[in-house]
Structures are given as structure tokens and as C-alpha cells.
């Protein structure tokens, strides 16, 4: 299953793949490995990203273009960049606090 929350923006050429068949194909497994993927509300996924099975992306997170997401849990307000990916937890929460006029 793939669950996409409200107000998410998924750019062009993004691959969301909850199944991995390579072990079955080369006869090292009897079944295809399937894992759910969840994008909470207000997640942005840049172009040419790959999101692998078992990933849970917290709300208000940004996945930068070209990133391969293979870690199971991305906390809310994170910036995720690169391959191998780097998770900057709370990056956007810090930006919101810094720009809050109150």
C-alpha cells in the first residue's frame, strides 16, 4: 500500500516502489518483498527521486530532487538530500521558528 497525505506535491519522474523482486528473480527468495510507503501531509518530493518500500515520511518534509529514500522513518520537518541520502531532521521547523515574527 502507498498512502499519500493531503497537500503533498510530487514532482515529475518520481518512482514510488513498494515491491522489490530482484531476490525472487534470481531464485534467492520465494516471494516478492513488499513494504508499505507513507507520506504524511504537506510533503514535497522533488523530481527524479526514488522512494523505496518501508519508508515513512513525516509531515512538512522536503525530499530534494534526485534523492533515493531508503531509510524507514523520516521525522517531520526534515530535509532529505542526496545519494546516499542525508536527513537533516527538523530543518524546516528551525526555519519556521527563525522566520516567525512573534
Where are these regions (language model features)?
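Flexible, glycine/small-residue-enriched loop-and-beta-strand segment within the central core
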Residues: 1-56, 67, 72, 83-84, ...
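Catalytic beta-strand/loop signature of glycosyltransferases that borders the donor
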Residues: 75
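Leloir-type glycosyltransferase catalytic cores
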Residues: 101-102
Amino acid at each position: 500500500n502507498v498512502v499519500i497525505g493531503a497537500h503533498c506535491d510530487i514532482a515529475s519522474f518520481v518512482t514510488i516502489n513498494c515491491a522489490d523482486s530482484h531476490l525472487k528473480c534470481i531464485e534467492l527468495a520465494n516471494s516478492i518483498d513488499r513494504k508499505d510507503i507513507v507520506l504524511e501531509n504537506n510533503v514535497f518530493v522533488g523530481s527524479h527521486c526514488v522512494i523505496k518500500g518501508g519508508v515513512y515520511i513525516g509531515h512538512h518534509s522536503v525530499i530534494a530532487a534526485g534523492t533515493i529514500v531508503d531509510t524507514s522513518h523520516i521525522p517531520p520537518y526534515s530535509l532529505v538530500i542526496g545519494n546516499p541520502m542525508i536527513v537533516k531532521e527538523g530543518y524546516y521547523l528551525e526555519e519556521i521558528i527563525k522566520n516567525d515574527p512573534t
